[in-house]
Amino acid sequence: MVHYKLSYFPIRGAGEVIRQIFVYAGQSFEDHRISIEEWAAVKPTTPFGQLPLLEVDGKVLPQSHSIARFLARQFGINGKCAWEEAQVNSIADQFKDYRNEVRPYVMVKMGFAEGDLDALSKDVFLPGFKKHYGFIYNFLKTAGSGYLVGDSLTFVDLLIAQHTADILSTDPALLEEFPQFKAHQEKVHSNANIKKWLETRPETQF
């Protein structure tokens, strides 16, 4: 039996979609959570000095979206054809662009940097959120299935549904402009495996 080990910090962050891919597929995995204190010693041993890392029978794969794409293909949630897979990957790449754009706000909010959180919210996060969620919303409306691509769940549905849930828990008014995202989040999180995971996973702020 293949042994999967996911190493990431004890937060949701970039590792959560990977955890949820395993959960959705019903695949057991080792959820290795590395504390900030442990990270200094671990960092030099990683390929790019970053987490998450996936180990598959001892072979190491870095980069969150590379891991997600690999597992999505393994478990059949990467799209039903090459075109759908390309669309799925484009949404994942766009979401990474969004995260990079709002990173200054997120770093201050998480306490990893200093800055004016209110100003960063107004000038960085809100414009970035509306722009990028608007792009992704177009995929949801075009698909017309309740999923982002095609007529079945793909890993980007897990990715976006988790972020939507995070937004709903902190500032639900942001989604008034994108009403179908709430229904999308509810649809994705109604899956029995995912629902159980959300109820039992470790509580983290981010």
UniProtKB/Swiss-Prot annotation:
InterPro entries: Glutathione-S-Trfase_C-like (IPR010987), Glutathione-S-Trfase_C_sf (IPR036282), Glutathione_S-Trfase (IPR040079), Glutathione_S-Trfase_N (IPR004045), GST_C (IPR004046), GST_superfamily (IPR050213), Thioredoxin-like_sf (IPR036249). It is an enzyme of class 2 (transferase). Residues 81-206 form the GST C-terminal domain. Its EC number is 2.5.1.18. GO terms for molecular function: glutathione transferase activity. It catalyses: RX + glutathione = an S-substituted glutathione + a halide anion + H(+). SUPFAM superfamilies: GST C-terminal domain-like (SSF47616), Thioredoxin-like (SSF52833). Glutathione binds at residues 8, 39, 43, 49-51, 63-64. Pfam families: GST_C_3, GST_N. Gene3D superfamilies: 1.20.1050.10, Glutaredoxin (3.40.30.10). The keyword Transferase applies. Residues 2-79 form the GST N-terminal domain. It comes from the Eukaryota. Keywords: Transferase. GO terms for biological process: glutathione metabolic process. Belongs to the GST superfamily. Sigma family. Conjugation of reduced glutathione to a wide number of exogenous and endogenous hydrophobic electrophiles. This is Probable glutathione S-transferase 8. The gene is gst-8.
